[in-house]
Amino acid sequence: MGSGIMTETLTDSWLVGLLCLVLGFLLLQLYKLVWGASSRAYKLPPGSTGWPLIGETISFFRGINSTAQPRQFIQEREQRYGEIFRSNLFGRSRIVVSVDPEFNKHVLQHEGRQFQANYPKPLRNLIGKYGLLSVHGDLQRKLHGAAVNLLRFERLSVDFMEDIQNLLHITLAKWEAKRDIHLQEECHQLVLNLMAKQLLDLSPSKDTEEICEAFGHFSEALLAVPIKIPGTKYARGFKAREFLIKKIYESIEDRRQHPEAVHNDLLTKLLKEDSFSEEIIADFILFLLFAGHETSSRSMSFAIKFLTDCPRALEELKAEHDALLKRKGNLKNQKLNWDDYQSLKFTQCVIHETLRVGNFGPGVFRETKEDIKTKGGFVIPRGWTVYVFLTGTHLDEKYHSSALKFDPWRWQPHLQDQELLKNPSFMPFGGGARLCPGMHLAKMELALFLHNFVTKFRWEALQDDKISYFPFPRLIKGLPIRLRLRE
């Protein structure tokens, strides 16, 4: 009897296996049929779709995680297909990847007309439906305008400069007392404190420490496998989002309860706008907190890493800042003004090179609103995704000689911002209607940080550290360093 049951069980298992095999074969044929039918109507860019469903996603992430050559995925396909090629990434079988600088510029400049932002749904779910990556049309223009207004020249040159330098003096004194620090983690908290002050009028406290910790989980979830099971990075990201939104709503309720209190922050200004609901405001503030501290904090720790590995650049940077201090009378804790900041020419070179090599925003997603013709007579059909892969051009030897080398001197002939904005092979802040509104703030934060850090400290690396670009650019060990006061 036992033998009969076993035989029956084995037969059932064999049948189930056969059915799965047949079903898999049929799905593969259906995939090829649908793909073939959609492809035959157009002269699509050349490329490969990889495996069904997963496509080339694993190969893409394996490539960008290479510390030796983060362009590996692109390089192999560019040699085979050219700078604009078809792929199958992030669950999207109808996607074209571009590392063509001129085409990338065209895509970004024609937002709203020929293209519109269309990020993967798991990412949009985390960011929120009213985050700047998710919204379109009039609402996008209004929210983008609110961010631009917050960061207008008058506020940057006075309020932000004052707040950044006050916070730097307090923070660097704490680092001096600690002596041994993980710079990446400390910079995250530093910039989060600044953004929390400007957006929510929150001073450094246990609240801002908890917010910074939550953003760590939130960031990890953005490119995690989108499975919302307890314990996964994606699930932790949603829990972090709930916590962060709750904190923002608490600030909103506090303003409602105490209308007489004076707050010079963005939240107060948004609450006075009749056109913005509390849900829109909460998602928008969450996005700005994330975007405003992510690039700036990473650029600070990456800049110190690059300078540590390039003593010649560090010495030239120190000389520039020491000369500025001397011009200002070598007064202790002397604050810089806007003209001082503008005078730091080599510092600007260091900033641009840090942004180029660091690649803190690797790419942007756009959906075609009409059929798009590309060079070579190829067509990207309406409704397809274009992935503008900025890392692909930033680290391309055709546009930047010795592209993997940190070389700030390469920027000396190109220091005017307007000239840099016209360079399609260098777009660390995107472009067009969605040009990052915090571009000038991020550069100023990094310049003021470098000024205070290199004039106050000498340092040594406690461990050798390397850069990983997966799931986002980071220093694997967090850049542990030992600080000493300069004599």
Curated annotation (Swiss-Prot):
It is found in: Membrane. One of its GO terms (molecular function) is iron ion binding. The chain crosses the membrane at residues 14-34. One of its GO terms (cellular component) is membrane. Its EC number is 1.14.-.-. Keywords: Heme, Iron, Membrane, Metal-binding, Monooxygenase, Oxidoreductase, Transmembrane, Transmembrane helix. One of its GO terms (biological process) is brassinosteroid homeostasis. Gene3D superfamilies: Cytochrome P450 (1.10.630.10). Heme binds at C436. It is a single-pass membrane protein. Its cofactor is heme. Belongs to the cytochrome P450 family. This is Cytochrome P450 720B2. It comes from Pinus taeda (Loblolly pine).
